Amino acid sequence: MSTIEWQSKAEVVYESILQGQILPLSNGGNSYDIQAALALSTCYRLTPSKEAILKINESFINYFIQSKLNNPSAEIIIREPYPIACGSYDSTKKYVGIVHHLDPVIENKSWKHRWYFNTLRKNLKKLDTTITVSEYWKDELIKIGANNVNVIYNSFDVSKYADDEIKNDFKEKHQIAIDKKLIYIGNASKEKGVYEVYEALKDQDYELIMSGPVNNAPNIPVKYVNLNKSEYIKMLKACDLTISMSKMIEGWNRIAHESLLCNTPVIGNGTGGMKELLKKGNQIIEHDYNQLPLAIEKVLDNRSYYTSEGYKFVRRFDLTYFNESWINLINQLK
C-alpha cells in the first residue's frame, strides 16, 4: 500500500484529516482538500503533515526555511499552494499539487506576495500532476507550464440537499418576511460584491440575506446570519434565488453549486471557473449590476426551468464521482 503525506499550511485541514471529518472553520477550499484526503485515506496510508502548517505569527522566511528542511518519508506528497512554493523536491518521490485559483489582487500586495506567486508558478513544473477544479483554471495552469493538469470538480453528498418543506420555518426562525422573495447575496464581504448588489436592489421589493463566519459588510442594511452547515443548507432552500457577483477570479463557486443542489437558481457574473458552472447549468450570467432587477424578474418568472436545469447538471458531482476520481488519479500515478 502506497504511503501519502498531505501538506497544507492550514491547521484546520490537518485537524480535520486527523479527526476524519470537515471541521466547522473550514472554508470552501479547505473543505474540498479535506474531502480529497479523507477519500484517499480509505485506500492508502495517508497522514497530514504537521510541519507544513503555517503557525500564527510565523514569518514567511522561517516557514520557507522549515519547508525546505522537511523531508517526509512518504512515497507520494500531495501539496496545497504554500507547500508547492516552499517545499523541497526529491526525484524519488511523486508530487501532486492542488490549485483552486490564483488571485492577482493578492499577488500585487507586496514583494513577498509577488515572490511567492512567481515561485509557485515555477514549482508547478516540478509536480507530476496538478489538480484544479474547473476547465478555466486547467487552461490557465497549462499556460504557465504546469504538468499533467486534471480537473476534479467540487462535489457534495447530494442526499443532504434533498428537498423538503422548510422554507417558511427558516424565515420564521430568523424573522424574515414570509410574503417577500428571499435572495441570498453570498458571503458578507466586499470581495463577493455584496455592496454593489445591495445598491442595485435596495429599491426592489425583495428580502436580501448574506452569511459567513464574520460580517465583513456591516454597514449595509442586509440581514446577516452565521450558520452551521445544516442551517446553511436550510437557508439556501428557503431562498428564491442566489446572486453571486464575486470580484475574485473564482476557482469554481461552491455557494452557487450548493444553491443549485437545493433547487435554488443562480444569477452570477461568471468570473473564472464560475462561468463553466453557470453555463453548463443553464443559469443566467450577468455582468452589469444595473441589469440585475431584470435578470431576477426573468429567473423568477421561469424558476422551475432554472431549478431543473441547474440541478440536472450539479447532481452528477456526488461523493462517488469525487472519491473515485481521486483514487484513480493516485492509482495512475504509482
Write out the residue ranges for each language-model feature.
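Acidic anion/phosphate-binding donor-loop and adjacent secondary structure
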Residues: 156-173
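A charged, aromatic-enriched C-terminal amphipathic alpha-helix characteristic of glycosyltransferases
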Residues: 28-31, 301-333
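Conserved acidic donor-binding segment of nucleotide-sugar-dependent glycosyltransferases
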Residues: 280-290, 297-303
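Carbohydrate-associated surface elements
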Residues: 136, 155
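Nucleotide-sugar-dependent
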Residues: 244-254, 270, 275-276
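Short hydrophobic beta-strand element within catalytic cores of glycosyltransferases
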Residues: 265-268
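Membrane-proximal helix-turn-helix segments that form the acceptor-binding/catalytic region
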Residues: 110-130
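Conserved donor-binding/catalytic core segment of Leloir-type glycosyltransferases
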Residues: 176-192, 198-203, 209
